[in-house]
């Protein structure tokens, strides 16, 4: 793999989407059955792509925005994240084709982007950038 083989995957979905409205309209028993099917499918996805998953990431909570006006609560579409390693951007994206996030659950999409080197020499030369993501440390 190249030096630029690390990718951030962001799982997105809107609480006001038609998919979420349809999900919320399901009878409780059907929704629970789909949740169980979705959890099983997600576990199978993790097992299938275990070698490519650098960090499982996880669900994301409520968002705070910080800008020149201060701190404020905001809503966004981000629901979870993961970090994967792949030989190319295209290969990283292919890992998420038909992912349960949108194939079973009411998520809308997964966006995948390369994790780039920090520009302008902000990292001390000769050191690796280490990101602690829960159980694993990812060295880029």
Region locations from a protein language model:
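Conserved, structured core segments of small domains
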Residues: 1-140
């Amino acid at each position: 793999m190249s030096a630029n083989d690390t990718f951030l995957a962001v799982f997105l979905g809107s609480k006001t989407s038609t998919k979420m409205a349809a999900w919320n309209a399901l009878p409780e028993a059907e929704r629970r059955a789909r949740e169980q099917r979705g959890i099983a499918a997600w576990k199978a996805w993790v097992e299938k792509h275990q070698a490519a998953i650098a960090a499982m990431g996880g669900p994301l909570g409520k968002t705070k925005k910080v800008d020149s006006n201060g701190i404020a609560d905001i809503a966004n579409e981000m629901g979870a994240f993961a970090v994967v390693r792949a030989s190319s951007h295209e290969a990283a994206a292919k890992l998420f084709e038909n992912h349960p996030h949108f194939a079973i659950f009411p998520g809308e999409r997964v966006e995948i982007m390369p994790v780039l080197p920090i520009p302008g020499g902000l990292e001390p030369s000769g050191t690796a950038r280490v990101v602690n993501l829960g159980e694993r440390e990812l060295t880029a």
